Swiss-Prot record:
This is tRNA-cytidine(32) 2-sulfurtransferase. GO terms for biological process: tRNA thio-modification. A motif (PP-loop motif) lies at residues 45-50. Keywords: 4Fe-4S, ATP-binding, Cytoplasm, Iron, Iron-sulfur, Magnesium, Metal-binding, Nucleotide-binding, RNA-binding, Transferase, tRNA processing, tRNA-binding. The lineage of its organism: Bacteria, Pseudomonadati, Pseudomonadota, Gammaproteobacteria, Aeromonadales.
Amino acid sequence: MLEELNAKEKYSFNKLQKRLRRNVGQAIADFNMIEEGDKVMVCLSGGKDSFAMLDILMSLKASAPIHFDLVAVNLDQKQPGFPEHVLPEYLTTLGIDFKIVEEDTYAIVKEKVPEGKTTCALCSRLRRGILYRTAQELGCTKIALGHHRDDILETLFLNMFYGGKLKSMPPKLVSDDGKNVVIRPLAYCKEKDLVRYAEVKAFPIIPCNLCGSQENLQRQAIKQMMQEWDRRFPGRLETMFTAIQDVIPSHLLDHKLFDFKSINRDSGIIDGGDKAFDPPELPKAPLLDIDEMDMLDVIEVR
């Protein structure tokens, strides 16, 4: 599709491509996601996000100041209608190391989950276990997942509204089995950017609902809420994402994170003190993602 773009569309896509590369590079640097000598297992589901993650990581690898290896891994869960040929053919054309793991988790899920109920939770747990095992077999030091900024915010709201926790998706963590380090290189990337990137790149997308299951109602409601906010209040999601990167425990209520009991008159003013009755200090404009590429000359996309 790239060759079908006109000059204006190519300019726009060039900005998008640079923005996504910058976002991924910044996340990797901020959280020390990839280090010298790492072997990164890139989990490829066949969706837009994992395709984009692989594409961007391959691009960054070519110019990175450190050496690391990539291996793409797809789990064929034997869902009815899964096009087995698509990913091997695509990955072969890229010239990247890859492995297709075949495990009939679909049969297990259909046996365990009542008809009409969402299978996503059990399917996800089974998939994680297989991927963790595969990472060990391949000698991988990091496992890269394709969750993006919107996934992180959705999870934050799900935990707040339905779980009573201020908790989201970490950009980097130790896996459930304690043997793997999991990273999310797309943590700073907007979903709408990834959608457009996948469209232009014409990735061979495989639907994620071949099993017939759908997201649970709570996640659907959160997604719709965020889409409405983004439409009606431009910049709100950007501001909220900035907020979870600037947490002040002394101004929350979790005594496990801050020692409120020890505070006395000699403690001094902590983190600005109590400004509850002061006029709110709000920015004059939303914290929009201003792209410095707007100020540069047009660069031809080849």
